Swiss-Prot record:
Its cofactor is heme b. It is found in: Mitochondrion inner membrane. This is Cytochrome b. The gene is MT-CYB. Heme 1 (or BL or b562) is low-potential and absorbs at about 562 nm, and heme 2 (or BH or b566) is high-potential and absorbs at about 566 nm. One of its GO terms (biological process) is mitochondrial electron transport, ubiquinol to cytochrome c. CDD domains: cytochrome_b_C, Cytochrome_b_N. InterPro entries: Cyt_b/b6_C (IPR005798), Cyt_b/b6_C_sf (IPR036150), Cyt_b/b6_N (IPR005797), Cytb/b6-like_sf (IPR027387), Cytochrome_b (IPR030689), Cytochrome_b_C_euk/bac (IPR048260), Cytochrome_b_N_euk/bac (IPR048259), Di-haem_cyt_TM (IPR016174). Keywords: Electron transport, Heme, Iron, Membrane, Metal-binding, Mitochondrion, Mitochondrion inner membrane, Respiratory chain, Transmembrane, Transmembrane helix, Transport, Ubiquinone. Binds 2 heme b groups non-covalently. Heme b b566 binds at H97, H196. It comes from Axis axis (Axis deer). It is a multi-pass membrane protein.
Length: 379
């Protein structure tokens, strides 16, 4: 019997990536989120493909085509809600995956980490253009407000915005191109994910201790295939719970009103997974300053390897850094809450303080605390 996994050029790649891959014996459930993100991506591409078969990217018919999908297409409602809530699951897994990387020092794999940050940006861009497609009130005004931010770029800003819009306002041309972007970007994400994996398999996985695990490796299959399968079952259970019992819980009621350029909603806000960045944007009164802070809030992740001053890779044995990490998590949850609140006292002040704390922890406190821990180890 010929072992195809060892002889076929194609199966050899699959074998080396998912079957005979040497993996650390002590990686915890925090390492499950990579495979869960892969499942989310496949799920989003499949549900999105079926939605695209019935969706029309025209300002006159977009809203009614989504209604038609929910009412008239066989199981259209479940496909639509799996796609909408699948995006939320995608971002939950994404944030936990990035959080795991920060906590256990996985950012020292430079290529893997930088591709990951690019992936994060691409997924955020995909989610943004996708939110515009149902052409509800929040879709239209969200697109108007966020694309308008580019006008803060000196000299070329206004031209850039009009170029993205395809006119002098968000209209038919904008919706058509956003649909095109939303269709192509997931395939770019899939390609980037493969590059992400390629670089990861060059070094091998990190583990909770941050210590090299070459001395104790186990094959990926069956140990981690079983472990990942459990994670996938739980993910799908949680997603279906959301889809079947509370499909609109994470959405905005304003998006059930067709887009109207003459009527601005009282509170324009993005989906929940962008609220932390939106709160940082709003906390700065200056337009350009806000845009820079918004970009910096994600781009700051690229600096993580440079800001690592500890002699230990992981936070597992660094209690002070752990405290700071969980303060950062609490701060991000506070920013998420603030992003959904109206622009008035006391929310503005809380948002400004939380934004300052976010940058303060990452840029200043983390490196200082790490250095203090290094000195304490000398005792």
């Amino acid at each position: 019997m010929i072992n195809l996994g060892k002889t076929s050029p194609l199966m050899k790649i699959v074998n080396n990536a998912f079957i005979d891959l040497p993996a650390p014996s002590n990686i915890s459930s925090w390492w499950n989120f990579g495979s869960l993100l892969g499942v989310c991506l496949i799920l989003q591409i499949l549900t999105g493909l079926f939605l695209a078969m019935h969706y029309t990217s025209d300002t006159m018919t977009a809203f009614s085509s989504v209604t038609h999908i929910c009412r008239d297409v066989n199981y259209g409602w479940i496909i639509r809600y799996m796609h909408a809530n699948g995006a939320s699951m995608f971002f939950i897994c994404l944030f936990l995956h990035v959080g795991r990387g920060l906590y256990y020092g996985s950012y020292t794999f430079l290529e893997t980490w930088n591709i990951g940050v690019i992936l994060l940006f691409t997924v955020m861009a995909t989610a943004f253009v996708g939110y515009v497609l149902p052409w509800g009130q929040m879709s239209f005004w969200g697109a108007t407000v966020i694309t308008n931010l580019l006008s803060a770029i000196p000299y070329i800003g206004t031209n850039l915005v009009e170029w993205i819009w395809g006119g002098f306002s968000v209209d038919k041309a904008t919706l058509t191109r956003f649909f095109a972007f939303h269709f192509i970007l997931p395939f770019i994400i899939a390609a980037l994910a493969m590059v992400h994996l390629l670089f990861l398999h060059e070094t091998g996985s990190n583990n909770p201790t941050g210590i090299p695990s070459d001395a104790d490796k186990i094959p990926f299959h069956p140990y981690y295939t079983i472990k990942d399968t459990l994670g996938i079952i739980l993910l799908i259970m949680f997603l279906m719970l959301l889809v079947l019992f509370a499909p609109d819980m994470l959405g905005d009621p304003d998006n059930y009103t067709p887009a109207n350029p003459l009527n601005t909603p009282p509170h324009i806000k993005p989906e929940w997974y962008f609220l932390f960045a939106y709160a940082i944007l709003r906390s700065i009164p200056n337009k350009l300053g806000g845009v820079l802070a918004l970009a910096s809030s994600i781009l700051i992740l690229i600096l993580m390897p440079l800001l690592h001053t500890s002699k230990q890779r992981s936070m597992m044995f660094r209690p002070f850094s752990q405290c700071l990490f969980w303060i950062l998590v609490a701060d991000l949850l506070t920013l998420t809450w603030i992003g959904g609140q109206p622009v008035e006292y006391p929310f503005v002040v809380i948002g400004q303080l939380a934004s300052i704390l976010y940058f303060l922890i990452i840029l200043i406190l983390m490196p200082i605390i790490s250095s203090i821990e290094n000195n304490l180890l000398k005792w």
